[in-house]
Every structure is written in C-alpha cells, then in structure tokens.
Design a protein with these regions (language model features):
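A structural supersecondary motif
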Residues: 94, 134-138, 312, 337-376
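Bacterial N-terminal signal peptides
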Residues: 11-21
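Mature N-terminal segment immediately following signal peptide/propeptide cleavage
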Residues: 48-89
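Signal peptide processing junction and immediate N-terminal pro/mature segment
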Residues: 21-34, 108
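Bacterial N-terminal signal peptides that target proteins for export
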Residues: 2-12
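Active-site-adjacent, His/Asp/Glu-enriched structural segments that form or flank metal-binding
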Residues: 80-81, 90-105, 109-204, 229-232, ...
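An aromatic/glycine/proline-enriched structural segment found at the starts
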Residues: 31-47, 215, 252-310, 314-315
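Histidine-acidic residue clusters that define the catalytic metal-binding segment
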Residues: 39-62, 150-153, 210-251, 283-288, ...
C-alpha cells in the first residue's frame, strides 16, 4: 500500500458528534442523588455532567458522588423487560502509562476480569454464566488510550443476581487477583493477542498514528503495548500500576435497565462506598499537541492492500464547556461535513478519479482536534 498523508494547521469548521447519554460519563458531585427539579432555583447544585453547561438536565437520570469520589448515574429503562446493563469506566488508558509500562492498562483489564481476592480465580466468570451471562457479548471490557470500560449485561436481572454482580465488580476493582500466577497466565494471553493483531490493518493504523501524532504520547502508546514491556511485567509492577490508577475518584458507574433507580443507587453505595485506595493517585499526564513542524508527508507500503490517501488538518485538543451554543455550532459543522461527504460520494459514482472519499472530524484521545480526508483512488 502507498500511504501519503498530509499535515496542516489549517482551521476548518467541523463537528464531533455529541456524546449524549453515554453511560460511562454520567455522574454527580453530591452524596445524595435526588431527581433534579427543572424548576429549581439557579443556585441548585448541577450534576457534574452538566457543570459549566446550560443544557437542560435530563431528570430521568439519578446522579451522585460517593464520599470517596466515585461518581455514578442510574435510570430506569424497561425495554427490554427484566434486563439491566452495568458499565464501569476507569479513567486510565494507555496514555497514562509510563514508558516502561506500555500495555499495562490493557494487562490490568485482563487481570481484573479474572476475579478478586474475595472470589476464587476464574469463579466470577462461572457465577455470571449461571446467571445467564455470555462471556464476550454480555460480559466484556475494553481499553483505549484514555480509559478502560467494563461492561456487564444481566439478561435476567433479579435482586439476588444484581447484588452478587455488584459485589463481584467491587472486588475486581478494589482487590483484583494480582500474583505471579495470574500475571504469567495473562501474559500468555496478551502476547497472543498482540501476535494475532499484527496484520496489515494494524500496521497501517500504527503508521498513521506515528505520523499524525509524532512527538506526542499517542504516537507510540498503543493499548496492546510492546513485547518487551509485556514480558517484563511482574506482580509488583502491576500492583503499583493498580494502586496509582484504580481508585474510586477515577471511577464512574452507570446502571440502566428494568430496575428501580433507588435500588440501583443503593447497590452502588453498599458495594463501593467503603472502597479506599492507599497513597495518592497519579495526575493525568500531558498528552501534548500536534507539532506543525513535523514532516508533512509519509508513504507507507503494505503489500496486497489497496492504495489510499489520507490528509489530516490537526489542531490542539482543548476541552469545551458543553453549552447549548457549543452544541448548535457542532450541529452546523456536522451538517457541513455531511454535505461534503455526500458530494464526494456522488462524484465517485459518476466516474471520478476516486472510488471512495469521505471527510470527518475527530477529537482524538484528548491529543488532537483533527479533520481527516480519506480517498481511495480509482487507479
């Protein structure tokens, strides 16, 4: 494959789709979580999701923050009946790793899913299977550059199954099975994942990342890590990583399903309220900004892969207050992008010089605000 991306500091008006209602981002900074009265005074404490925002509060969600800093959000959703979904997000991903810890966030995900010191190794999986949970579809986890999310869907949720599941999850987060045996067992798994993922698309993705984000942590910190750092992992190193990042103040829990919100809230308080982490947590590192002086182009050859061209306009990523005006501007930008992509699609259908083309905007892992144009030429 010939790959020729281009870097520019040009500023374009575009949009990243609003992350509305994403479970892992919902919570509130007060111990008690009472449904919000839309007619309350302006002095009311707004849920943390709505801090510095004038977006109307969704009163269907019950927000709260425990005294240990853990944030949560719960709501009733009776469709489909009898089912409950739990999401737990830990604010640690590959970008939080030190140079000699590459792959540790993903490694920790594997260790955490094995169980805890209160549940025999591997027993949590068997318990959930008895509750009708299918591993992979109903129970899974994912590590990204900026976070680790644990997902559990209970197809036949009862008070007993919810209580058991929340107890297991709390133990996994606070006291996972980190010992020489579990670290060695999961090392074989993550190294196998790395070997299996080392295909053409993975190499193209790595080349993209190294070029576009040169000089930034994102360029070289893929969640899967490196062979050297994975082989060097020990129980002591993984325990130190866990203590730095797996902390209640870095945790957000969301529960949605056929459940009374008051019961869901109490389950969180009962199982996570006493969680304390030793020492002091680590500060979020600086993710850097795109370097306008970095090389503008790169050609990457991958045999057997169709020729494509990617151009990127990269700007520093900055957080924005989630206001109504901000979202209106994002909507305008989204429409503009859709218009451009539609015209590119029509040009391709009428026999243009390319088979496919599209444009999109991405806020990339808190590292860049980018506009990307992708083209597959016709010859």
């Amino acid at each position: 494959m010939r790959f020729s991306p281009r870097r520019s500091a040009a500023s374009l008006l575009i949009l990243s789709l609003l992350l509305a209602g994403a479970p892992q981002t919902l919570a509130q900074p007060q111990q008690t979580a009472t449904p919000v009265d839309q007619g309350a005074s302006k002095a009311q404490v707004r849920p943390w999701l709505y801090e510095n925002s004038d977006v109307p509060i969704d009163a269907a969600w019950r927000f709260g923050t425990l005294s240990n800093g853990l944030r949560y959000a719960v709501r009733r959703n009776g469709v489909p009946p009898g089912q409950v979904s739990i999401r737990l997000r830990m604010d640690v991903g590959s970008l939080m790793e030190r140079a000699d810890e590459q792959g540790y966030a993903h490694y920790m995900e594997h260790l955490t899913m094995r169980g805890s010191r209160h549940v025999p190794d591997g027993e949590s999986k068997r318990i959930w299977q008895r509750l009708g949970v299918t591993f992979g579809s109903d129970s899974n986890a994912q590590t990204t550059p900026t976070g680790t999310t644990y997902a559990l869907d209970l197809p036949q949720a009862t008070q007993a199954s919810l209580t058991e599941s929340m107890k297991i999850l709390a133990g996994m987060m606070a006291e996972p099975n980190i010992n020489a045996g579990s670290v060695d067992a999961e090392r074989a798994v993550v190294l196998a994942e790395k070997r299996e993922s080392d295909g053409p698309q993975s190499r193209i993705s790595d080349a993209n990342r190294l070029h576009f984000f040169a000089g930034q942590p994102l360029a070289e910190h893929a969640p899967i890590g490196t062979v050297d750092t994975l082989k060097a992992a020990t129980a002591a190193k993984m325990e130190a990583f866990h203590q730095r990042w797996y902390r209640p103040e870095n945790t957000v829990i969301a529960i949605s399903g056929d459940i009374d919100p008051a019961i869901a809230e109490q389950l969180i308080k009962d199982n996570f309220g006493n969680w304390t982490a030793p020492g002091k947590g680590a500060a979020i590192p600086d993710f850097g900004a795109p370097d306008p002086k970095a090389p503008a182009t790169r050609v990457f050859v991958e045999p057997g892969v169709p020729v494509s061209l990617t151009m990127a306009w990269l700007r520093p990523w900055t957080p924005h207050a989630d206001t109504i005006v901000y979202n209106q501007d994002k909507l305008t930008d989204m429409l503009a992008l859709q218009i451009v992509s539609r015209r590119l699609e029509q040009a391709a259908r009428t026999g243009g010089s390319f088979l496919q083309a599209s444009v999109e905007q991405q806020d990339v892992s808190r590292s860049a605000d980018g506009t990307f144009l992708s083209i597959i030429p016709s010859n």
